[in-house]
Design a protein with these regions (language model features):
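Amphipathic alpha-helical segments used for helix-helix packing
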Residues: 38-57, 109
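Amphipathic alpha-helical packing segments from all-alpha helical-bundle domains
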Residues: 4-11, 55-81, 90-94, 118, ...
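Short, solvent-exposed positions on alpha-helices
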Residues: 21, 25, 87-91, 114, ...
Length: 149
C-alpha cells in the first residue's frame, strides 16, 4: 500500500513541477506540493503517521531511496543553470529533502493540520528562497527534472 501511494505522490509532484516553465518555480512548487499532501487523509494517515511509527528507520530508508536521487539531480541542474547558490550537492539535497519531509510530518502530527500547513509552507519558502540566486537564471525554462521530497 505504501509503495502504491508513493508512486501516486511521485506522479503528482512531477505534475506540480512540470506545470511551471521555469525550473526554479517547478522545484519550489514540487516541494510545497509535498506539504499540501499532508492534509489529504489517506496520505496523512498512511505515509506521514502510520509508516513512520510502524517502520521506524526503515521509513527513512525508503524515503531516501525514493527521493534522494531525484533531489540530487534537481539540485545539480539548478546549480548548473545558475538558479541557486553552489555548494555540496548531496548535502544540500539531503537538507532540503529532510526539511520538507520533517515539515510534512509536523503538519500531519498536529491536532489541526490545516492550521499548521500555512506555517510550514511559509517557513519552507524562506528556506528555499535562501538558496535562490535572484539575478542569475531568471526567466530560463530549460527543463530541470523535478525533485521528490
Amino acid at each position: 500500500m505504501l509503495a502504491e501511494i508513493d508512486r501516486e505522490v511521485g506522479a503528482r509532484l512531477d505534475a506540480a513541477a512540470q506545470a511551471h516553465p521555469n525550473p526554479w518555480e517547478g522545484f519550489r512548487a514540487c516541494c510545497l506540493s509535498y506539504l499540501d499532501l499532508a492534509l489529504e487523509p489517506e496520505i496523512q494517515r498512511i505515509v506521514l503517521r502510520d509508516a513512520p511509527a510502524v517502520l521506524g528507520q526503515r521509513f527513512r530508508d525508503l524515503d531516501e531511496a525514493a527521493s534522494l536521487g531525484p533531489m540530487i539531480e534537481s539540485i545539480r541542474e539548478l546549480m548548473e543553470g545558475g538558479y541557486i547558490r553552489t555548494g555540496d550537492i548531496e548535502v544540500l539535497a539531503r537538507l532540503v529533502n529532510g526539511a520538507v519531509l520533517e515539515a510534512a510530518l509536523w503538519v500531519a502530527a498536529g491536532e489541526d493540520p490545516a492550521q499548521r500547513l500555512p506555517r510550514a509552507r511559509s517557513t519552507v519558502e524562506i528556506l528555499l528562497d535562501g538558496l535562490r540566486l535572484e539575478a542569475r537564471g531568471a526567466g530560463r525554462s530549460d527543463g530541470v527534472a523535478p525533485p521528490r521530497p
